[in-house]
């Protein structure tokens, strides 16, 4: 049945009266209530709100994917204008018809790329499959187009990446592959669910500009779901604010940022971490806690130095980690990924050292090498005076009580077959620290500490939003009262209000228990809040390291300054010109076997502040 008369000629999508409910233990839970929206051709609509507010559920309903989770969807209308100008009612389409619509006319970039990519197929095969299905291209043509899309999303060595599997890429690389796949068929509507969450600020700036360029070329409508208000200010034309399943405010981006009317919108904007807010302060500071009922209420700030003088609890000396790449008829190792190259640093009890840098810079590999989840090629890792890089697995296990981790992808970290209570309790059972009622009480306490309810212990990971799953992972890491926590993008999936709560929780635990954090992040505003010291990584090497105040207020290395300049500002009237990198501005860290990377020489430029001296033949000199 034609619907063209029901949709304005400028609109590509119209939704009215959307209601989504789930049934759980005999009760109906309303996830979305009476949400309506319109999207014009070439327009970007940002949907913002806290974790669990219904943003992602709304997007899945538009893709007709939510019914498979047992949801009850009721909607007045859900009209889509396809690329061929035909207007269809999405709710009336059969599964077979929706398979032709998805990807070609309405595409989606999901929040967690590792769960969206097939682990048994190469990156090239997965992108090419979508191109063959919707464009009728041959296998060779599809692979050529897949390579072109990888080049467009600024992935270096794109030809080599085509033959790699998802697990061989960093989190940021996987997210860029997802974006390339979604854009490969040039859909009429693109739904982007936290597409830049896993990306560092420089790649984020490139991806946002790339989406804008493709949007203008194809007059594509974009629904951008995010918790990053800086991104909203940078990319959105209009904003829809969701709170507890309802649309509480909508308007132009200027209206929302400069004259918000709803208390929750005011709360969201007040909770946004601002780069430069720590100027003049040397120690980490809690985020101000703001409630929707009292948006002007800030808690007092009490600075307390938690760093314990004496011997470092963790020492790293000359750490090198490389990964072999096989090729040729005999599958020999011909090249290697130089993931981490000769880095050294110390971590003191009660200190937070942040590792920052672009995707693929070696931050996460450094954390995994310290946990012995990947083996280092050379170097020393000394924990509490004991060298652990050469310990056997049996001798290493007791030390794992003292070194815990929070990974970037929460869904991949939790067993989908077990309740979250079981997952949190598992470390206690393995190390013999709790059974029965005592362990259950500990689990309930941990869930409350990270902002969840004790009854959530009986639910499964798929029943939570991405932000809630990350909080569960944080609770599990705290279960054993560790001395060191390696937090790999621990708050990147959280909305701004919950992010502030979690950072405050980490700071509270540091004060109470003297925990040391190795905080791996691309969020410079959060790093500025939580850090005592900062180390900036580029292509596997540390190029600047020093006290947080020195690095942020007086960055010496050009790469550090580039990272600072790429941070989006949460104000649409303050767009800053940014240098957007071309693909050849991002050198590759893949080298021929036996080829050595020139070592970076660090110079002391201030108290505890070290900066790399650029080398003539080094990629750093081009910055």
From Swiss-Prot:
Q: Which UniProt keywords apply?
A: ATP-binding, Cell inner membrane, Cell membrane, Hydrolase, Membrane, Nucleotide-binding, Repeat, Translocase, Transport
User: Which intervals of the chain form a coiled coil?
Assistant: none
Q: Which reaction does it catalyse?
A: glutathione(out) + ATP + H2O = glutathione(in) + ADP + phosphate + H(+)
- CDD domains in the cross-refs: ABC_NikE_OppD_transporters
Q: Which family does it belong to?
A: Belongs to the ABC transporter superfamily. Glutathione importer (TC 3.A.1.5.11) family.
Cell membrane found in the keyword field: yes
Kindly give the InterPro entries that the UniProt entry links to this protein: AAA+_ATPase, ABC_transp_ATP-bind, ABC_transporter-like_ATP-bd, ABC_transporter-like_CS, Oligopep_ABC_C, P-loop_NTPase
Query: GO CC terms for this protein?
Result: plasma membrane
- Cystine bridges: which residues? none
Compartment(s) where it occurs, according to its Swiss-Prot or TrEMBL record: Cell inner membrane
List the membrane topology term(s). Answer: Peripheral membrane protein
Q: Name one GO molecular function term.
A: ATP binding
**What Enzyme Commission number(s) apply to this enzyme?**
7.4.2.10
Pfam families per the UniProt record, alphabetical: ABC_tran, oligo_HPY
Enumerate the residues binding ATP: 49-56, 357-364
Q: Which organism is it from?
A: Salmonella paratyphi A (strain ATCC 9150 / SARB42)
Q: What this chain does, per the record?
A: Part of the ABC transporter complex GsiABCD involved in glutathione import. Responsible for energy coupling to the transport system.
- Superkingdom: Bacteria
Q: Domain ABC transporter: where?
A: 15-269, 325-564
Q: Which GO terms describe its biological process?
A: peptide transport; transmembrane transport
Q: Does the keyword GTP-binding apply?
A: no
Name of this protein: Glutathione import ATP-binding protein GsiA
